[in-house]
């Protein structure tokens, strides 16, 4: 070794020492942020920060930190400081009061590929403009118009489930709820009927499933987290978290549908796509100049694609968790079926107004969303340094609300792991702080399709429970283990037994039952 040393000059040794020093400093430099703020949290490792803790799962890590550090703590995703908050007043300030001025945007790695202008990642004025164009698609009047279309697909769902029930086999519930969600979304949004339940190999379904295969420890994700300066470089090189073949398929398919509208092949109903196209009228949206209202052609395709992705995954997962909760809590399912038999005796067709007035159905769905919020974390980025409740949050810091953990806080929810729909009864609902229950987010940047999803879920579940019951089987995993994904989903498919109901109450019997009020 000693004979090797002289071959390096003093300048070389100086440069090597400087390089090593820079590497060490780079690895440790960002991790003093929360110490200076007096914020507790797990000890970060050089370069990785606290990311390796995610091997436990997002939800487990967040809950562990809450139990150890209290309602405010700091973590590091690579070099990125993330302030986690479960204080109600801070949550309100971040999501509501200062949404437009400071906390407008979500975290964005800028590796979204063609989805760079989708509503979910759009920022500031671009987000406001796109949101204002899309909002009319989700008014009560529009949703009521879509209800008839939803019923067509819920009927197909029911037929498919009946075939499976007749075989007396266990079912992977998402294999039914996924196609139903896809069919409802494509038909209401673009007036395109896929019938994916009977065509499981349809490219729309197979491609959307490929989009969901996101690994937290994906090399691309790790590279950007550990070396943030590579993000803009990778973006310029067209790298994306989403498979290129998948996004190319959807953009080509949606462009073809839009082209048909542009050439006069219009639909009889005003759907999601048509409302976006109409926004272009009177606006020059193809020149790339500053937009004042209408959407560009590319923005239209991006919103259509994110609507497919979000509508498929969030709705089908919510329905799967709801079926699981009913199967593992038979007394709740029985009570819900009593309400269904009262409101719609003798398997009467589902009517929109009556469905919206079902109190216990609301309670059950809300409680399922409390236990399994599809977005287990809400994130916002501080556009400038701000002080909230005596805490100075630096510019570019991520502020994170751990929804999963918040929804299971024993100081807020008694027996938080128990499935108790009565928490959301009319008597109890008023006492629930809106900043402790946020399955769809909160504030101006909440989920725009929330009411659409709830109607679709309620309709399908009521029609299913008119004819069937869910029950656990040997293959049902209890409790569920969550996967390490951005959206909440079980690590393994939820498998249940579906059985035809016997002795469904007659019209006379059903109408004598009192509608549950808790």
UniProtKB/Swiss-Prot annotation:
GO terms for biological process: progesterone metabolic process. It comes from the Eukaryota. Heme binds at residue 447. Its main location: endoplasmic reticulum. It is found in: Endoplasmic reticulum membrane; Microsome membrane. Its EC number is 1.14.14.1. Pfam families: p450 (PF00067). It is a peripheral membrane protein. InterPro entries: Cyt_P450, Cyt_P450_CS, Cyt_P450_E_CYP3A, Cyt_P450_E_grp-II, Cyt_P450_sf, Cytochrome_P450_3A. Belongs to the cytochrome P450 family. Cytochromes P450 are a group of heme-thiolate monooxygenases. In liver microsomes, this enzyme is involved in an NADPH-dependent electron transport pathway. It oxidizes a variety of structurally unrelated compounds, including steroids, fatty acids, and xenobiotics. This is Cytochrome P450 3A27. It comes from Oncorhynchus mykiss (Rainbow trout).
